[in-house]
Amino acid sequence: MKKIAVDAMGGDYAPQAIVEGVNQALSDFSDIEVQLYGDEAKIKQYLTATERVSIIHTDEKIDSDDEPTRAIRNKKNASMVLAAKAVKDGEADAVLSAGNTGALLAAGFFIVGRIKNIDRPGLMSTLPTVDGKGFDMLDLGANAENTAQHLHQYAVLGSFYAKNVRGIAQPRVGLLNNGTESSKGDPLRKETYELLVADESLNFIGNVEARDLMNGVADVVVADGFTGNAVLKSIEGTAMGIMGLLKTAITGGGLRAKLGALLLKDSLRGLKKQLNYSDIGGAVLFGVKAPVVKTHGSSDAKAVYSTIRQIRTMLETDVVAQTAREFSGE
């Protein structure tokens, strides 16, 4: 049985969206058990599942504006902290939260703990491409500064994930840069490039540019945390902007525009789904001793369900243990 500790109080629509996503996951997956951490009375309002689920009550939670490290240290009974401790103590196999991203990263670093020989765990997510296959990118902001050695480790981690969780036999690894030529980039990118070229275990395809990411140029894209987070926000903003422009054009375009939208309804719905990567799951703090997964703060029940499905696959493929063995040299 795969045991998942869930912070029921994190996120914009908690606990309703969290619990409703859990209900659906428990209905569809008979091999998971969920521990819900949070306000028992509020959780029970939405919990319909009766088997393989338990509630661990706490009145304390971490708010979105709390300073991450201080919150983890001072709010020892917060729902997120208790969920992370359950993983550390072996009572759960993975932790899921839609709450404060920085606090969850801190919980991953300081409570769950790093895998031996991994210097800086990275935040990784699967982002959308026009062909619907997506690509994995890390680091998306777990670290403000990185070395070339960190980025090399991210390439190995991302390749492991793409192989074991997404089923890609030979993931194409690209280094995010300001040009595709091998001579491009600052000293960090140039040093990283040399490390990736020298690692024969990687299917390294060279430098990739941000404009090509959504065309599926690579299966795994490596970046420092600052750049990766900026690209993530740009993709999110572009997706929202496109949908907003379409909506404005349709609503303000008169009868002909509305009729055209009606004819294109299925295509527009498909476009919206393609740009909405919540179906794929959450962002993984990769490089810690167990799956620590952050779903978007605005996640609905469907996104929570998708993230639980993602965690289930990670546990099923034992990707974290395989990563630990790889980096420990066993």
UniProtKB/Swiss-Prot annotation:
Gene Ontology biological process terms from the UniProt entry: fatty acid biosynthetic process; phospholipid biosynthetic process
Cellular compartments annotated: Cytoplasm
Catalytic activity: a fatty acyl-[ACP] + phosphate = an acyl phosphate + holo-[ACP]
Transmembrane segments: none
Gene Ontology CC terms: cytoplasm
Pathway this chain belongs to: Lipid metabolism; phospholipid metabolism
Record's keyword terms, sorted: Cytoplasm, Lipid biosynthesis, Lipid metabolism, Phospholipid biosynthesis, Phospholipid metabolism, Transferase
GO molecular function (one): phosphate:acyl-[acyl carrier protein] acyltransferase activity
Family the entry assigns: Belongs to the PlsX family.
Role summary: Catalyzes the reversible formation of acyl-phosphate (acyl-PO(4)) from acyl-[acyl-carrier-protein] (acyl-ACP). This enzyme utilizes acyl-ACP as fatty acyl donor, but not acyl-CoA.
Oligomer and partners: Homodimer. Probably interacts with PlsY.
Protein name, entry field: Phosphate acyltransferase
